[in-house]
């Protein structure tokens, strides 16, 4: 199989026992991205937290200086003056109950991020079981529940990404594309790592950054020396 052959070629370029510097890792992530499409470059960060405890959750959002390379479709759930404000700011879809019903009845998901004004959360709450498992539920911590919809849309379109520790204590976040220059990946990497380090819960004990790895969509994982993540 072609893909298997490419993957094997990619694995020959890395030493699985080596902890690379961030620069070396970004260079290797691009070299091992051999698929015939613009692969996403993603970070996987294993944290020393127990997400079963509410006081050890790691969640937030950060604007990457060079974005992710992906066109993000934004759905805004609002009413009144906020509708025009959202449209002017570049939202892809703006409305209220009609979109809530569309999601419920038609299983409609032609969007990547949902922004809602606080006065809409009573209605949006009906979507908790649908949007929650997909990581699409608006949340004040990630800045997606706000009356300042224009600012939220602008930040999302500029490259704002959400990060959240999963039940296995890992955070998965895209930091760019194969088409990015190494320096842009490195800039995005540093900004994201700074945010995650700042988000360390006070209840987390011991080593916080257990492991950090970067990979392309179809490429192997490349381990990064967690001591050097901000160098």
Swiss-Prot record:
Sequence similarity: Belongs to the universal ribosomal protein uL1 family.
GO cellular component, as recorded: large ribosomal subunit
Keyword Transferase: no
Function: Binds directly to 23S rRNA. The L1 stalk is quite mobile in the ribosome, and is involved in E site tRNA release. Protein L1 is also a translational repressor protein, it controls the translation of the L11 operon by binding to its mRNA.
InterPro entries per record: Ribosom_uL1_bac-type, Ribosomal_uL1, Ribosomal_uL1-like, Ribosomal_uL1/biogenesis, Ribosomal_uL1_3-a/b-sand, Ribosomal_uL1_CS
Keyword Ribonucleoprotein: yes
Name of the protein in its database record: Large ribosomal subunit protein uL1
A Pfam match: Ribosomal_L1
Subunit structure: Part of the 50S ribosomal subunit.
Species whose genome carries this gene: Clostridium kluyveri (strain NBRC 12016)
Keywords: Repressor, Ribonucleoprotein, Ribosomal protein, RNA-binding, rRNA-binding, Translation regulation, tRNA-binding
PROSITE patterns, sorted: RIBOSOMAL_L1
GO molecular function, one term: tRNA binding
GO biological process: regulation of translation; translation
């Amino acid at each position: 199989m072609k893909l298997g052959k490419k993957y094997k070629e990619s694995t020959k370029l890395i030493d699985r026992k080596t902890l690379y510097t961030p620069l070396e890792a970004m260079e290797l992530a691009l070299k091992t991205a051999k698929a015939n499409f613009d692969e996403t470059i993603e970070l996987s960060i294993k944290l020393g937290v127990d997400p079963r405890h509410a006081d050890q959750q790691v969640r937030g959002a950060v604007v990457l200086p060079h974005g992710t390379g992906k066109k993000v479709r934004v759905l805004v759930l609002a009413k009144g003056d906020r509708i025009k404000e959202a449209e002017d700011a570049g939202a892809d879809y703006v409305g209220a109950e009609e979109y809530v019903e569309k999601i419920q009845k038609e299983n409609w998901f032609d969007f990547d991020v949902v922004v809602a004004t606080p006065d809409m959360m009573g209605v949006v709450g009906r979507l908790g079981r649908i949007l929650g498992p997909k990581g699409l539920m608006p949340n004040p911590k990630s800045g997606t529940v706000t009356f300042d919809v224009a600012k939220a849309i602008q930040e999302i379109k500029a490259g704002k990404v959400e990060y959240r520790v999963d039940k296995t204590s890992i955070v998965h976040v895209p930091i760019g594309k194969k088409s990015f220059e190494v320096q842009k990946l490195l800039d995005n990497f540093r900004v994201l790592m700074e945010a995650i380090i700042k988000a360390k819960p006070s209840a987390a004990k011991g080593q916080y950054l257990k492991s950090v790895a970067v990979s392309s969509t179809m490429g192997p994982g490349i381990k990064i020396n967690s001591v050097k993540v901000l160098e």
